[in-house]
UniProtKB/Swiss-Prot annotation:
Disulfide bonds: none annotated. InterPro entries: C6orf15. One of its GO terms (biological process) is extracellular matrix organization. This is Uncharacterized protein C6orf15 homolog. Residues 1-26 form the signal peptide. It comes from Mus musculus (Mouse). Pfam families: STG (PF15809).
Amino acid sequence: MQSHAGGSRAPLGLLLICLCLPGLFARSTGAPEEKASPHSGQPSFTSLLNPGQPQPKPDPVNNELLGVLPRLSESPQDGALPEGGSEVPNGPPFWGPPPMESWPSEDPQQGMAAVAEDQLEQMLPEALPYLSRGGRLPEASSARLRQPSLAASYPQDSEAGLQPGSSSLETEAEAFARSPFWFLIHKLLPGSSGRILRPGTSWGSGGAGTGWGTRPMPYPSGIWGSNGLVSGTSLGGRGPYPVRIWGRNGWYPLRILGGNGRYPPVGTWGGYGQYPPVGTWGGYGQYPPVGPWGGYGQYPPVGTWGANCQYPAGSRRPNCRYPAGSWGTKGQNRLPPGAKRPGSSGITP
């Protein structure tokens, strides 16, 4: 019996311990909560468990504040407060985050650089469709870049020191809005010229498409022009090559080949030249075909073989010895050695 009674008491003891443990934990946690609670008007958890103990009276000021807070949350959107809550001070609630003015101020130049980077990052995706054609950005984008939002966010005493930076930033923004493609090229190639490159700007002195520099270049107009050395008018009026040289007063080839030149085809080979075809072979030349072989020449065909010459035409004529005179009349000429006269017996007289 005793063992049976001892075995039945053990579960009952465990059950009582399990029922008492929550109360003990609630009492141990309720004591510090009651000490640290800012609202002393609300009854604590332990006081609710012990109704026999005297409860403290609620504070009327705290109750009034607690009544105002729900009314603030239910107030209209225009910010009008009820008449009973006029004594509540204006400003942020005490449970909100600390105001921005309480934070330590940062360096204004770092903030300016960060804002500029943010603006460029916002503008780059909008400018991508305009890069290939160099068009203008929409008016909203350009107006957003031109807003002087940076100067208004800084104190007045630092305004004078930040004006040059803001003006340069505005200039770059205007250049980017005007021609995004060339602005990015200028940024990617910092060694290029200081001015922003534009496709519509003239590369020369006389407008777009008239030249490749601000000064006259040697190619291609001037050298090929009126007084140049190579083709164009160089091949024209006064250049050394090649038209006038091939013209009337040049060395090669027209006048040289003309009337008074030394070489063919006209003057050299003309009336008073030393070489063929006309003067050299003409009336007063020393070589054929006309003069040397003509009336007063020493060689055939005419003078040499003519009336008073020895060979071969005059030789066959009346006063020559060979061969015409030898075969002529009156027998005054001797026959060749071993020759016989016609009709004779072969005896020489």
